[in-house]
Amino acid sequence: MDNKTPVTLAKVIKVLGRTGSRGGVTQVRVEFLEDTSRTIVRNVKGPVRENDILVLMESEREARRLR
């Protein structure tokens, strides 16, 4: 991984549900470790559970909510 790429650490606070054509993506609500008052919804590929720490390469993008 390139040391010049800024990354943001975020903690999974709630698993919202599965999405994707085959359910291979999990929608989660994350809280930023640097700014705990800020939370966003992201899509995560692979296994994930509450209290996991995610490394976000891009922290401004928010996922659309499940219907």
From Swiss-Prot:
Give the matching InterPro entries. Answer: NA-bd_OB-fold, Ribosomal_eS28, Ribosomal_eS28_CS
- Domain of life, per the record? Eukaryota
Residue(s) carrying N-acetylmethionine:
1
Compartment(s) of residence: Cytoplasm
Q: Which GO terms describe its molecular function?
A: structural constituent of ribosome
Concerning PTM, the database record says: N-terminally acetylated by acetyltransferase NatB.
Alphabetized UniProt keyword annotations: Acetylation, Cytoplasm, Ribonucleoprotein, Ribosomal protein
Record keyword Ribosomal protein present: yes
Q: Which GO terms describe its biological process?
A: maturation of SSU-rRNA; positive regulation of nuclear-transcribed mRNA catabolic process, deadenylation-dependent decay; ribosomal small subunit assembly; ribosomal subunit export from nucleus; translation
| GO CC annotation, single | cytosol
The record's subunit annotation is: Component of the small ribosomal subunit (SSU). Mature yeast ribosomes consist of a small (40S) and a large (60S) subunit. The 40S small subunit contains 1 molecule of ribosomal RNA (18S rRNA) and 33 different proteins (encoded by 57 genes). The large 60S subunit contains 3 rRNA molecules (25S, 5.8S and 5S rRNA) and 46 different proteins (encoded by 81 genes).
State the function annotated in the UniProt record.
Answer: Component of the ribosome, a large ribonucleoprotein complex responsible for the synthesis of proteins in the cell. The small ribosomal subunit (SSU) binds messenger RNAs (mRNAs) and translates the encoded message by selecting cognate aminoacyl-transfer RNA (tRNA) molecules. The large subunit (LSU) contains the ribosomal catalytic site termed the peptidyl transferase center (PTC), which catalyzes the formation of peptide bonds, thereby polymerizing the amino acids delivered by tRNAs into a polypeptide chain.
- Similarity-based family: Belongs to the eukaryotic ribosomal protein eS28 family.
| Note in the entry | Present with 94500 molecules/cell in log phase SD medium. There are 2 genes for eS28 in yeast.
Write down what this protein is called. Small ribosomal subunit protein eS28A
* The organism of origin for this protein: Saccharomyces cerevisiae (strain ATCC 204508 / S288c)
